Amino acid sequence: MRNERRKKKKTLLLTILTIIGLLVLGTGGYAYYLWHKAASTVASIHESIDKSKKRDKEVSINKKDPFSVLIMGVDERDGDKGRADTLIYMTVNPKTNTTDMVSIPRDTYTKIIGKGTMDKINHSYAFGGTQMTVDTVENFLDVPVDYFVKVNMESFRDVVDTLGGITVNSTFAFSYDGYSFGKGEITLNGKEALAYTRMRKEDPRGDFGRQDRQRQVIQGIINKGANISSITKFGDMFKVVENNVKTNLTFDNMWDIQSDYKGARKHIKQHELKGTGTKINGIYYYQADESALSDITKELKESLEK
């Protein structure tokens, strides 16, 4: 399996970290307000999970231990708990200054831990919420999940509109859900950004192409967010986070990551989980290649070594 280094690829976690990191740009009462608002926002979105059984002891971000985080993009709507359609597992090692990232296709066929059945990995969230999804990913990759960040994908719309739109670079022209997207650099509003991240059937790369567009939108959000200067926009952004994000990271964790893990965030190794599509009882699944999965697991474990 070949690792592809993609510069400037960020994750949903950095959307939150960027907001916090921008606090250092403020001065006086402005910075004071933002600091305390950020702290209260993070406290309000906290959700606990069990300590990983694959860890003898909990990691310490304060001591600059390598750690892992699972990014969960959940497509929740009114009256529908939704599924974890985006699953990105990351390891962050400040000693080697590297971050390893693997996107798990939502149709991946695997054992759902806690339910005892084989199914699509994204169904784990519908069956048992955050904890079941974390347990299932740990079993699938055979690595610990220390932290998670769960984001309602619907929030992309609110975030993008709060920022006044974002710019992405579309690799080809396509239409989806009533919206048309040209090839090249395009500007998206909130509804367009959401549609842009959801299309996959017209993409020759299928779910992998969709994942790339999600990362493009995230990068666009981060780039635009770095230029926020209005306290009103900060207030709106905090509201979006409060309504759409859950994590077991504390405010201190986030601040330590922002200050002590900068080098690791600049060197990201992207792993693509190779496999093939198959049908079982008439239902489509993505069957991960066992050899490729084993190679990824080995590299992830190595990246978590101190």
Curated annotation (Swiss-Prot):
Stated name of the protein: Polyisoprenyl-teichoic acid--peptidoglycan teichoic acid transferase TagU
GO BP annotations, alphabetical order: cell wall assembly
Residues on Extracellular side: 33-306
Subunit note: Interacts with MreB. Interacts with FloT.
Keyword check for Transmembrane helix: yes
Subcellular location: Cell membrane; Membrane raft
GO molecular function: phosphotransferase activity, for other substituted phosphate groups
InterPro entries: LytR/CpsA/Psr_CW_biosynth, LytR_CpsA_psr, TagU
Function: May catalyze the final step in cell wall teichoic acid biosynthesis, the transfer of the anionic cell wall polymers (APs) from their lipid-linked precursor to the cell wall peptidoglycan (PG).
Taxonomic lineage of the native organism: Bacteria, Bacillati, Bacillota, Bacilli, Bacillales
Organism field: Bacillus subtilis (strain 168)
Pfam families hit by this protein: LytR_cpsA_psr
Keywords per UniProt: Cell membrane, Cell wall biogenesis/degradation, Membrane, Signal-anchor, Transferase, Transmembrane, Transmembrane helix
Domain of life per record: Bacteria
Gene3D superfamilies with a match to the protein in the record: LCP protein
Membrane-traversing stretches: 12-32
Cytoplasmic side: 1-11
Recorded topology in the membrane: Single-pass type II membrane protein
